[in-house]
Amino acid sequence: MSAKHLSGKTALITGAAGGIGAEIARRFQEEGASVFVGDLNREAGEKTAASIGAVFILLDVTSEESWIAAFRTVMERAGRLDILVNNAGINIRKNIEEMDVASFDAMIAVNVKGPFMGIKHALPLMRAGGGGVILNMSSICGLVGHKFTNETYTTTKGALTMLTKSVAVRYAKDNIRCNSVHPSTVETPLVQTLFKDPERKAERLGEIPLGRLASTADVANALVFLASDEAAFINGVALPIDGGLTAY
């Protein structure tokens, strides 16, 4: 791909204060996009936005009012919305027998209801601008069951996968593409903490044909491509970013 693949495009990225979201924001800005960093963590979000020359928006993805206010800010500042990245997500690490209903509801609210509301309010803005791209951060757990995660997380990511495909079919007529990406474990500070046990990390790496964890750059680079015009005919795809894990 040539330089500046997202020049002239405006993107709102949720959960972008740190980790994968921050790297997506950095790469999008690097590729010429006007980036809005959406997050509930003001301090970290403002720091990330300032470091790349982006705009921070305080965004609670579980609140429709917060979504409406965020899009209002985008339109006031940039005048258009070309890309929405639904990256925000949570995982309460309990199996189905341990999971209480309140925790289940919390995961549904962030991982499913959040993207639903974001897409709902992004669609008319994208349509008015002649089209757009919606990218949803799912997981390999949105494609297959996996022993390293829990049933509720898998349920939410599976729902997001099918929401993606349904939106892709219905809104293609408006030149709006919708795709999901499905990383395996990504090496972030949180994951490094979880894998302090070398045996546990070795077991995880043993499942991945490429023999390593994904980096945040691996994920962000895939999203740059999917958001760009080079991916103009890619719609409704569930893209694994997993080093071959789901190829077994």
Question: Which residues fall in each region the model found?
Answer:
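Short C-terminal tail/terminal secondary-structure segment
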Residues: 2, 144, 224, 235-248
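Canonical Rossmann dinucleotide-binding motif of NAD(H)/NADP(H)-dependent dehydrogenases/reductases
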Residues: 5-36
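Substrate-binding pocket helix/loop in short-chain dehydrogenase/reductase
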Residues: 95-96, 103-108, 204
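Active-site helix of classical SDR
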Residues: 119, 156, 164
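Alpha-helical segment proximal to the catalytic Tyr-Lys
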Residues: 124, 169-170, 232
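Residue(s) in the substrate-gating loop at a strand-loop-helix junction
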Residues: 139
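Short, small/polar-rich loop/turn modules that mediate ligand/substrate recognition or access, typified
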Residues: 172-177, 234-236
